[in-house]
Amino acid sequence: MATANINGHGERPSAVARFPTAPSVMTMNGNFASVGDAPTKEQYERGIQVIDEQKEFNPNLNTYLQFTDTAHSGFNYHLISVFGSQSTGKSTLLNHLFGTQFGVMSERERRQTTKGIWMSKNKNQSSGASESETMADNILVMDVEGTDGRERGEDQDFERKSALFALATSEVLIVNIWEHQVGLYQGANMGLLKTVFEVNCQLFLKDKQSTPRSLLFFVIRDHLGTTPLANLKDTLIQDLTAIWTSLSKPAGLENSKIEDYFDFAFAALPHKILQPDKFVTEVQKLGTRFRAGHKSTRAEDAGFEGGVFLPEYHRRIPADGFSVYAEGVWDQIVSNKDLDLPTQQELLAQFRCDEISREVLVSFDGKIQPLEEKQAEDTRSGKPTVIADLGSTGKTSRTSTVKNFETQASRYHKGVYALKRTELEGKIDTRLKALYHGQLVAAHKSGVASFSDAVSNAVKLGQKRAASYEFADIVEREKETALKTFETEAKSLYIEGLAWTNFKSQYDLYEKDLNEVSGNLRKEEMRRLATRVERWVRSRLNDSIGVEFNKLGSGRGGSGAPETGEKPASEKDLWDRIWKTFVDTVKEAESKFTDRAKSFDASEDEIEVGLWRLKRKSWGVLRAKIDEEVMEGNILLKLRENFEDKFRYDEAGVPRIWRPSDDIEGIYTKARESTLTLIPLLSKFKLSESSSLPELSEWIGSTPASVDPKDEEDLTPIGGVDEEEGKSLEEEMTVLSEAKRQDLVVRFKKTADGVYVEAKRSAIGGVAQVPLYFYGLLLALGWNEIVAVLRNPIYFIFLILCGIAGYVTYTLNLWGPIIRMMNAASTQGVEIGKEKLREFLKDNEMGRQALGMQGRDHGDSDGISLNTLDSRGKRASREEEEEEEI
């Protein structure tokens, strides 16, 4: 089993021989996620067994890739496999080189450690001293079971299958050999390399369309330096060439060279035990070669510029599909079928494209399905409605869905990807076509109904009043608007490249239906015009009236004061300014309304009614804005700003810095009284120039004779104008009732008092400072006591506990409650003491004689009464006690 101990005693190798970070009891990758296990997070952090010794593939490989954040890296990953004879230190090399934790062999019991194929992610991401020498991202390392082991004996079936699997998936094949094995056949793994060459012919030479390459990276261990690396390299190349020449190759490739399909790299490492420091240094240098690079002609770079990961080595399998691809390859290998990698890639592409298609359609369904359900429900109810932003939603959903599919699936087989994309687009377009057709039907019905009603009403009104109007202009204009609306909706549904989104025939049918409709359009247009003008008046009044109220009493940089510092107009003429602004705004609105109404060829009566309604509506807007400004919170804030401008700043607009010598009380009283005079001013809408109420009835005018009762339904009664409502002009112009005025005065005074108290505190705080020399004097006089406390453990610990208690109390904001409790307790204690003393004097004969007091009834001396205290610890008054009892 993969989790068995390396030796029967469960003991480690000697301290000299073992890897410094190895566990005390060495196991064969016991902490990895093995085949058949329920993997844990800790196991995934170390690695995973891809294939066990029974040739079973691990179905959790994709989960491991997701756990290591490799599955989403696309093509930005690299796969390395290591080959070599059993017990030659392959796992040890990988652990040092990539920071992995593969199980290593115990010298006490020379037996097989690695069974099957194991994988772990590189953990030495920063091997290089500089950024240019940093190892590549997402390096996956496969530790392949060693060859020539006594456990399998002459059974080379797994050896051949594992070599075939590694070659089909890996970019770099590391061959781990010892220096003294160079020149041997079995010792130098030439038998294994012959197997690699044979499976390479089986895999790639049959595919004449491409020439995949792989890198054979020879790591020569225990290199003493007596034989130069170049000589060892030449020997290995000669042996490899001889093996390649002896292979039986496909027709037409008999004269091919080994260099056409393989690149070679070489590295030498010193003895791990005899030269441990140098071994670690050379391994770190070797790690810097595992990064992206390209071919180089310079000999000193060993044929590579930058690193050994060349683009042509990559198998071009996206990381999220690697587990499926690897499992398919292994199934083919185990079943002893001819491994056809192009077919495997197509199968992988079909599987992944279908899977990706289902995933992206989930997002598409989330956006489109609610719209489909709404449209179906409206159709069943007989009231089809136009769904807002359907065109942009459909177009965006289609584009994003296809784009997401393209982003993930385009990395797979191009032919399969193109076919699956066409299928996906067909599914999307079928649903959008039905949805868009229903949208246009709803737009058609609602548009025709709206147009028909509008034109019919316009005709009836013209016939009733015998007024002249250009019906053709009205119909043409409304028709143009309706057509434009339909056209806009149709264009919003258009998708470039899709012929079925050209809705010209539906547009022609819609235009034909509009040509059959007539109605009374002008009145509707007049009402819409009135609404637009009223909205404009509301917008203008909201801004201008708000500015006037913001100027309220702000003598310098208040919220409404100009930036230049000039004082605004007097506070007394506030209502005059508001009335003038209101009249000017409405006059401008009347001009706009009249000009626009004449362009509709409206009658004088219609214009008169419209202007009459405009004035009444505008007054309602003004009253609503005034009521909003004098709401309790708003007006109180403005009064506070007015008070603070006068209290906190001098006549020149300079902020006051309070000192004890300042006449804070006088300034406060003056500012407060000045602000209080504003409240009566604000309570009634009265013009200061004439000292009278505005002539609202005269300004609005009498009700036009041609007014329609329907025109008065939405109008609010106005005091002094609509006398039948029983509300006078005086009541209409009252802004603040007497009760609100009194309440506002009380609230403002409380607010002003708070500002005053704050100013007094700031003035007192400026002088309540302890002189600095006092601290030096305190330190000098109390030095002996400080030393005594610090040297006495009891005092020192007590001091620390007091400090901790004080800090906790301060952090929890408990000082206030504690002080109030102490004050209350002390006050209560004094009262009880006085009461007991009074009882003693009354009960004592000498005390009575001295005080001339009458004896008291001893029957009432048993109880001690407790007084009711207020929040400050004072004795509460009798009235407060009675209220407390109620």
From Swiss-Prot:
Topology term for the membrane: Multi-pass membrane protein
MF GO annotations: GTP binding; GTPase activity
SS bonds (residue pairs): none
Cross-referenced InterPro entries: G_GB1_RHD3_dom (IPR030386), P-loop_NTPase (IPR027417), RHD3/Sey1 (IPR008803), Sey1/RHD3-like_3HB (IPR046758)
Keywords, sorted A to Z: Coiled coil, Endoplasmic reticulum, GTP-binding, Hydrolase, Membrane, Nucleotide-binding, Transmembrane, Transmembrane helix
Location in the cell: Endoplasmic reticulum membrane
Sequence ranges of Basic and acidic residues compositional bias: 372-381
Start and end residues of each stretch annotated as Disordered: 372-399, 851-886
EC number, as in UniProt: 3.6.5.-
Gene3D superfamilies, sorted: P-loop containing nucleotide triphosphate hydrolases
Positions on the Cytoplasmic side per record topology: 1-769, 815-886
Enzyme class: hydrolase
Binding site for GTP: 84-91
Keyword Cytoplasm: no
Listed GO biological process terms: endoplasmic reticulum membrane fusion
Superkingdom of origin: Eukaryota
Domain GB1/RHD3-type G residue range list: 74-313
Sequence ranges on the Lumenal membrane side: 791-793
Coiled coil: 502-527, 722-743
Stored PANTHER family: PROTEIN SEY1 (PTHR45923:SF2)
Function: Cooperates with the reticulon proteins and tubule-shaping DP1 family proteins to generate and maintain the structure of the tubular endoplasmic reticulum network. Has GTPase activity, which is required for its function in ER organization.
Family: Belongs to the TRAFAC class dynamin-like GTPase superfamily. GB1/RHD3 GTPase family. RHD3 subfamily.
Protein name: Protein sey1
